[in-house]
């Protein structure tokens, strides 16, 4: 058995982006949000994910812009560190080690070099207590610095970041907990407390849920469980304080936010309606309804042009100041629980699972982006606590991705159970699934499982239910409507036992159906019962056929913590082992099978082939939660790994979902390094960011450079020093600081032109030499006519005695011979 080597469990996306309030950059071009152990940066114009700020080892719990630099952002995490980032380029600037788990982060313009954190302190009675502390950030050239200078500002505060807010730029801080509002003044170093009764005259719930401070006035807005909003004034006096009450929300107010100039107050709650209250006249308000899930956070940009709302369905809405939604950033929708399995759409290769109520969501794992929702229930969802509504509980694709089967139900009690079986056909025109058939009474009791045939030649759906029957559904032609619909083709049962699981073999020739402790094998062509396999004690929990060379094996797990492997050729038990398997998942492209085991409050992973009981790979303590959902995702390009422990990841990648709704995957260090070098690398050549444009043009320039090297001598190659610098500046300067394209065009073209100054000078010199030689030849011809013999003798004597001269010396001599010395005659004539 190969033990754990360099394979690690990593978050592959889908983390909560609504965990903390999103923040908008000062120029309203970027929105930053917490996402698991990283911070995601999105564009407000395109809603596209730009990059991640990765470096924390635990959940990020707060983010805030650096008041001294608008292009920097602080982030705090439960790992006990605060990091300072350049969020434009995604570069980590500095890490401050605090040493305590951090739950929220606040900054103030009037407190330079100081940040405020909510930390957890354990008291003598082992009760967790939260404190607000001020941390003085030391100035150091080192990248990692310890910041141990903490001073307590307030004790026994709420860990909810919405219950703490700074007022008047940092003159005071307001924080609420239960029924008490506290205001701490930094200059006076004094705290004033104000309390409310548990219930008022109308039996309302007065507990505080959030607070917000006006940016310029002495006013504090508080939200409460009963949906009321209170505006507190004169809170610098214990007895003379006043408050006014406004009420619109029918349930708890989740978040409050003043606009930067303080002219409006924004509020949000479970109603999915953003309410804008006019500060001067609270009776005037505007509404932006139907935003999706309940609003959990509200934030505004520094210029007041954009608002952001974070929703319970893991979505961020970008809203203009005119109260118009301009963009949506949708993460992996995280409901209370996932009823369907994790599936891969054969066409789009997207991850498919439960989305918002009554929908299936299609999510791109490669881009970490929500693609679209498919409305299964096709009914308006009412956001009201305790209301029983339809939910999608089962879904499955056929082999080609042409058909989708879903089961929706409502009613927690058997007598009130109502469910529908729906079959959806893929429409090539709309590139989506269209409802084809609805079966209102597919079974008399709840459907427990369903699966499509794995054969591409026939399309067949099998369902099992607690009514003791399994049914096979096939397509039937409708002559009147000129289309196919689905109908029941066969009904099977076994000794009045209740079936729970079903699956087809790799070639679709055998159907396996489990009836409590008995395995039954059926022929889909004749519906003949081929054989039964007597399972060891315990009801069958899961079934899985082997693939490729292991297709003759059938795996099953039981409630008695047994994993069994059956040989279908001999109809005998090949091997079995005692292990509590919570999820059994086969790889469609190999013989490998992954088994998640839950023991001692931890989940462990075993990867094996059914033909070999000894695991190929094992990793203990994968996560703390139980894993019930997993899927193998085929890779677009096979990953060639020579390491024996990583070979099971070559063709497919294993994803799994925890009870905490964290989507995780297994990745090798080699694969992460390869991805980092290709797409996440931040510096190269003089610490310049790598962009796709640079990689494309840079490759072309390297090829051209190689070609020039092969065809020309090094001394003959022109130097493009200035042009190269210009091109580098154009390619590597951040887009937000570049001038307009019209200005860059002429500069870029000029930089590509070869400088001809040296060539022109050389050409001029050559022309002068040619003219000089021509004139010299003419002069020599004239001299030959008058004294040819003397010239011949002089020339002969020179040829015999002169040393070899360089070309430069010869040119100089020729120029001297050309010089006009006629001016000397005047001197000779004037001599007495």
UniProtKB/Swiss-Prot annotation:
GO terms for molecular function: RNA binding. It comes from the Eukaryota. It is found in: Nucleus, Nucleolus. GO terms for biological process: positive regulation of rRNA processing; positive regulation of transcription by RNA polymerase I; ribosomal small subunit biogenesis; rRNA processing. WD repeats lie at residues 4-43, 47-86, 90-134, 148-187, 196-233, 239-278, 281-320, 326-364, 378-425, 432-474, 485-523, 527-567, 572-609. Residues 764-785 have a biased composition (Acidic residues). GO terms for cellular component: nucleolus; small-subunit processome. PROSITE patterns: WD_REPEATS_1, WD_REPEATS_2, WD_REPEATS_REGION. InterPro entries: Quinoprotein_ADH-like_sf, WD40/YVTN_repeat-like_dom_sf, WD40_repeat_dom_sf, WD40_rpt, WDR75. Residues 704-723, 759-811 are annotated as: Disordered. Keywords: Nucleus, Repeat, Ribosome biogenesis, rRNA processing, Transcription, Transcription regulation, WD repeat. Its main location: nucleus. Component of the proposed t-UTP subcomplex of the ribosomal small subunit (SSU) processome. SSU processome is composed of more than 70 proteins and the RNA chaperone small nucleolar RNA (snoRNA) U3. Ribosome biogenesis factor. Part of the small subunit (SSU) processome, first precursor of the small eukaryotic ribosomal subunit. During the assembly of the SSU processome in the nucleolus, many ribosome biogenesis factors, an RNA chaperone and ribosomal proteins associate with the nascent pre-rRNA and work in concert to generate RNA folding, modifications, rearrangements and cleavage as well as targeted degradation of pre-ribosomal RNA by the RNA exosome. Involved in nucleolar processing of pre-18S ribosomal RNA. Required for optimal pre-ribosomal RNA transcription by RNA polymerase I. This is WD repeat-containing protein 75. The lineage of its organism: Eukaryota, Metazoa, Chordata, Craniata, Vertebrata.
């Amino acid at each position: 058995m190969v033990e754990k080597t360099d394979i690690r469990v990593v978050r592959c996306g889908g983390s909560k982006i609504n965990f903390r309030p999103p923040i908008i950059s000062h120029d309203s071009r970027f929105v930053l949000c917490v996402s698991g152990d990283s911070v995601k940066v999105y564009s407000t114009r395109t809603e596209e994910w730009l990059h991640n700020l990765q470096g924390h080892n635990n959940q990020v719990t707060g983010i805030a812009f650096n008041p001294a630099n608008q292009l920097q952002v602080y982030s705090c995490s439960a790992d006990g560190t605060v990091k300072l980032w350049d969020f434009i380029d995604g570069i980590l600037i500095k890490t401050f080690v605090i040493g305590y788990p951090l739950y929220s982060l606040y900054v103030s313009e009037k407190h330079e070099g100081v940040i405020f954190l909510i930390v957890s302190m354990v008291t003598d009675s082992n009760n967790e207590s939260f404190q607000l502390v001020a941390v003085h950030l030391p100035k150091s050239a080192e990248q990692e610095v310890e910041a141990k200078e903490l001073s307590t500002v307030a004790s026994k505060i709420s860990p909810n970041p919405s219950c703490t807010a700074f007022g008047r730029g940092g003159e005071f801080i307001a924080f609420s907990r239960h029924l008490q509002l506290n205001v701490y003044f930094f200059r006076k170093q004094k705290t004033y407390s104000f309390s409310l009764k548990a219930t008022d005259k109308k039996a309302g719930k007065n507990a505080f849920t959030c607070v917000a401070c006006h940016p310029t006035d002495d006013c504090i807005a508080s939200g409460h469980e009963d949906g009321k909003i209170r505006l507190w004034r004169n809170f610098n006096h214990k007895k003379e304080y006043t408050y006014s009450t406004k009420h619109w929300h029918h349930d708890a107010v989740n978040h409050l936010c003043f606009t930067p100039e303080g002219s409006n107050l924004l509020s949000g709650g479970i109603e999915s309606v953003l309410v804008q209250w006019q500060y001067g006249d609270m009776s005037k308000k505007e509404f932006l309804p139907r935003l999706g899930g309940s609003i959990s956070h509200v934030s505004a940009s520094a210029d007041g042009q954009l608002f952001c709302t974070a929703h319970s369905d893991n979505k961020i809405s970008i809203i203009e100041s005119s109260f118009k939604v301009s963009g949506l950033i949708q993460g992996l929708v995280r409901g209370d629980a996932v009823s369907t399995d994790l599936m891969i759409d054969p066409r789009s290769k997207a991850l498919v699972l439960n989305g918002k109520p009554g929908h299936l969501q299609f999510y791109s794992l490669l881009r970490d982006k929500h693609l679209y929702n498919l409305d299964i229930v096709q009914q308006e969802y009412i956001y009201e606590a305790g209301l029983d509504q339809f939910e999608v509980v089962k879904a499955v694709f056929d082999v080609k991705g042409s058909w989708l089967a879903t089961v929706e139900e409502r009613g927690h009690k058997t007598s009130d159970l109502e469910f529908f079986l729906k079959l959806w056909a893929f429409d090539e025109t709309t590139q989506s699934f269209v409802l084809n058939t609805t079966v209102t009474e597919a079974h008399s009791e709840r459907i427990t499982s369903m699966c499509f045939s794995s054969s591409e030649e026939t399309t067949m759906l099998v369902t099992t239910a607690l009514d003791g029957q399994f049914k096979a559904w096939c397509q039937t032609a409708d002559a009147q409507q000129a289309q196919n619909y689905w109908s029941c083709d066969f009904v099977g049962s076994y000794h009045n036992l209740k079936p729970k699981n079903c699956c087809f073999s790799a070639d679709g020739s055998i159907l396996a159906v489990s009836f409590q402790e008995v395995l039954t094998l059926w022929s889909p062509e004749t519906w003949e019962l081929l054989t039964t396999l007597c399972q060891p004690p315990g009801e069958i929990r899961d079934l899985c056929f082997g693939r490729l060379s292991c297709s003759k094996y059938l795996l099953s797990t039981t409630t008695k913590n047994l994993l069994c492997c059956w040989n279908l050729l001999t109809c005998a038990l090949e091997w079995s082992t005692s292990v509590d398997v919570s999820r059994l998942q086969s790889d469609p492209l190999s013989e490998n099978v992954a088994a998640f085991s839950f023991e001692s409050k931890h989940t462990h992973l075993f990867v094996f082939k059914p033909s070999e009981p000894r695991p190929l790979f094992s990793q203990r303590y994968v996560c703390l939660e139980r894993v019930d959902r997993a899927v193998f995702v085929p890779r677009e390009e096979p990953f060639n790994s020579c390491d024996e422990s990583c070979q099971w990841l070559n063709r497919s990648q294993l994803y799994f979902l925890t009870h905490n709704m964290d989507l995780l995957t297994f990745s090798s260090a080699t694969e992460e390094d390869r991805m980092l070098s290709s797409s996440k690398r931040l510096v190269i050549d003089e610490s310049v960011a790598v962009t796709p444009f640079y990689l494309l043009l840079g490759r072309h320039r390297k090829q051209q450079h190689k070609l020039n090297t092969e065809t020309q001598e090094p001394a003959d190659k022109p130097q493009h020093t200035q042009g190269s610098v210009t091109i580098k500046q154009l390619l590597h300067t951040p887009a937000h600081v570049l001038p307009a394209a019209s200005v860059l065009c002429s500069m870029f073209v000029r930089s590509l032109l070869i400088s001809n100054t040296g060539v022109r000078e050389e050409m001029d010199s050559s022309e002068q030499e040619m003219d000089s030689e021509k004139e010299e030849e003419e002069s020599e011809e004239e001299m030959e006519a008058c004294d040819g013999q003397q010239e011949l003798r002089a020339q002969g004597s020179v040829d015999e005695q002169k040393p070899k001269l360089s070309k430069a010396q010869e040119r100089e001599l020729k120029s001297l011979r050309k010089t006009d010395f006629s001016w000397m005659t005047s001197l000779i004539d004037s001599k007495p």
